[in-house]
Amino acid sequence: MVGSGISALGLLLLMQGSVDANGIQGFFYPWSCEGDVWDRESCGGQAAIENPNLCLRLRCCYRDGVCYHQRPDENMRRKHMWALGWTCGSLLFLITSICLFWWARRQDMLHLPRFLHRKCSKLSKTVSSLSKDRRSANKSTTVLQSPGGEVETAAAVSGEDTGGEE
């Protein structure tokens, strides 16, 4: 169970890393082209400004004829940490629940408490009597006429085989 959770988390990080080619570091420290226009540092010099493809190959940002460096994206980093925290917390809760259930079953502790046992036994008797009433209501009497003209009466229960000869 733990292995499958770790594998799923590794796959998530690998897939995210293949998108922006930063790998796991790109997950924990994402970069972005967003931000204040005045805080941009130029990237690639004049050649990158004249050739947007060169700017992008240098893994820089290009906008409005300006090639500039990417900057750390704190909002995305917070979102990634939040998602990672919830994923790990949920996985830990799931593993703990499974282990606790397994332990309780081995200790033979999966019984109802005494104060609930009486209430549930009364409830099961009520449900049992209701199901008996339902079965008796489903019984019906059918009249069959044989080829010789004799009339036969047969009791049929819906959903059950009567077990008689044909």
Swiss-Prot record:
Q: Which domain of life is it from?
A: Eukaryota
Q: Where in the cell is it found?
A: Membrane
Report whether NAD shows up as a keyword of the record.
no
Report keywords, A-Z: Disulfide bond, Membrane, Signal, Transmembrane, Transmembrane helix
According to its UniProt entry, this protein's organism is Mus musculus
Which Pfam families has this protein been placed in?
Answer: TMEM190
Q: Where is the signal peptide?
A: 1-21
Name by which UniProt lists this protein:
Transmembrane protein 190
Every P-type domain range: 31-71
Q: Does the keyword ATP-binding apply?
A: no
Q: Which residues lie on this side of the membrane: Cytoplasmic?
A: 103-166
